[in-house]
A protein has these predicted regions:
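Alpha-amylase-like alpha-glycosidases and glucanotransferases acting on alpha-linked glucans and related
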Residues: 1-11, 23-332, 341, 357, ...
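Single, function-defining residue in the core of a domain
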Residues: 13, 17
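Substrate-binding cleft and catalytic face of glycoside hydrolase catalytic domains
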Residues: 18-22
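Flexible, glycine/threonine-enriched loop-and-boundary segments that flank and lead into catalytic domains
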Residues: 236-242, 342-368, 430-446
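Active/binding-pocket-proximal capping segment
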Residues: 300, 390-395, 423, 431-432
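Carbohydrate-binding surface patches
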Residues: 352-415, 462
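Trp/Gly-enriched beta-strand surface patches
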Residues: 402-446
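C-terminal beta-strand-rich structural cap/linker in extracellular carbohydrate-active enzymes
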Residues: 444-463
Length: 463
């Protein structure tokens, strides 16, 4: 009853699922070999399979290509032999086209409707046991990825050795997989296990596609980590502006993170000083789902491989780092209800001497009678300027066939519900320093709000 006990404490139990492949020694490889991408002949005369039989079942032999053992080549297939009939198949390893094959895996063939339904049933089974499912490497099952990797267009070499032999025309490809698999997953889960939250790990700049077109509930937002780490601030600000121009609700579906098990640790990427805490402040105060990596708060530097059963470095938690989280970050997390929604979210350009300073992130939000304004300078340079009018965002107007989208913008004074009257003042507290400020409401209404920030400085105004 672990799931029930967690739910009583406000925690949802999540499962990680790999829908794209199985292990090369899985029960499906033994009992349902037709579900995999395969061929009857060996794709290369240099491949040999004389090593140990890796199958757990005596009915079937499974052989890794010999050059993996000598680390002198990396075959795209392994060999499966039916020991009763002699039937021999060469099943492809998983391969995302960016590196070597994953040589302990077997790639499921998603052009096979039987394979798609088998994976679908497994997903539904997991959903009945876990209220959250995280899909590993979900982007490789988008149709354009299946096309690029496994069934290229005629005349194209393809990204994986020997797959050009299995080229399909557009018409043939669409006939075999008319719908996006993930769209079908979202619809089936909504119908059969409706309280399940689906979370996709999707890279290759496909995050927007997964939420806009495929309807995925949450999607990893790798741009947050990568662009802020590299201080590609204009790029990330543009991505936020483009998102709210299309549909601000999409911001809520992004999972923002500073590291994950496949990446370097947060300490390695962002350090332990102001830049780390500035980006972490963005992570917990923007709409979307903030995700902390294992050991991030403690400042651990070891990157754990998936085969690790324990940590190999004897690391001690950095108490100073933990204390700063308690002071700067955790109180903001208790106010997530102020930051989590987008109905009142406004994103601002910071203007200085007639130009926009792209290094400063500035936005406001509110919930009920609680208001917030967040500033962060993601550059080791002094920066200052004014915010007054928000960037444009989309609003759906009307209903049914009459519904259309309008672009709107609000001022900072509207965002904070201020009035331009001489006898009105606004009092607010800066969270990091604990200092209180008082400003004339009329000044903010007429001129906007001024901000001056040192390199990597962040300020959060609340109360």
């Amino acid at each position: 009853n672990l799931r029930t006990r967690l739910w009583q404490r406000g925690i949802r139990l999540a499962s990680d699922m790999v829908p794209n492949h199985t292990g090369m020694d899985s029960s499906w490889v033994v009992n349902r070999p037709d579900l995999f991408v395969q061929r009857r002949d060996c794709p290369s005369p240099s491949y040999t399979f004389n090593g140990e039989n890796l199958s757990p079942d005596p009915r079937v032999g499974v052989y890794l290509e010999d050059h993996y053992y000598s680390k002198s080549d990396c075959s795209v297939v392994f060999k499966r032999v039916d020991n009763q009939t002699g039937d021999t198949r060469y099943i492809y390893h998983v391969n995302d086209g960016t590196g070597m094959p994953w040589n302990d895996t077997a790639q499921i063939d998603f052009l096979n409707p039987e394979a798609r339904e088998a994976v679908m049933q497994d997903i539904l089974h997991v959903a009945r046991n876990f209220p959250i499912i995280r899909f590993d490497a979900a982007m490789v099952l988008a149709k354009k990825s299946i096309r690029r990797l496994w069934y290229p267009q005629p005349g194209h070499g393809g990204d994986i050795y020997s797959r050009s032999e299995y080229a399909l025309s557009d018409q043939e490809f669409e006939a075999k997989i008319p719908n996006e698999f993930w769209r079908e997953v979202v619809d089936r889960v909504a119908k059969e296990v409706p309280d399940t939250l689906l979370l996709a790990e999707a890279f290759w700049m496909m995050e927007g596609y997964f939420v806009r077109t495929l309807g995925m509930h949450r999607v990893y937002n790798s741009a947050f980590m990568n662009m802020l780490k590299k201080e590609e601030n204009q790029k990330y600000r543009d991505s936020v502006k483009n998102t709210i121009k299309f549909d601000p609700q999409i911001l809520k579906r992004y999972v923002n993170f500073m590291n994950n098990p496949d990446e370097d640790t947060a300490v390695a990427q962002f350090g332990k000083d102001d830049k780390y805490f500035g980006v972490c402040t963005l992570m917990v105060t923007m709409a979307g789902l903030p995700m902390f990596g294992h050991g991030q708060i403690e400042g651990f530097t070891e990157k754990y491989g998936m085969e690790f059963t324990k940590a190999y470095r004897n690391e001690s938690p950095d108490q100073n780092l933990i204390n700063r989280h308690w002071h700067d970050i955790f109180p903001l997390m208790k106010k997530r209800y102020v930051f989590a929604n987008v109905e009142n979210f406004l994103f601002y350009d910071v203007w200085d001497n007639g130009g926009v300073n792209e290094n400063i992130f500035a936005y406001s939000n509110s919930a009920g009678n609680e208001y917030s304004v967040v500033f962060y300078n993601n550059k080791y340079d002094r920066a200052q300027g004014w915010i007054k009018q928000s960037c444009e965002y989309a609003v759906k107007v009307g209903e049914g066939e009459e519904q259309h989208v309008e672009m709107r913008s609000k001022s900072i004074s509207e965002g904070l519900n201020l009035h331009a009257e001489d006898n009105k003042f606004v009092i607010f507290r800066e969270h990091h320093s604990g200092l209180w400020f008082i400003r004339r409401s009329k000044e903010i209404c007429e001129r906007g709000m001024y901000i001056g920030l040192n390199g990597f400085e962040y300020q959060v105004y609340m109360d």
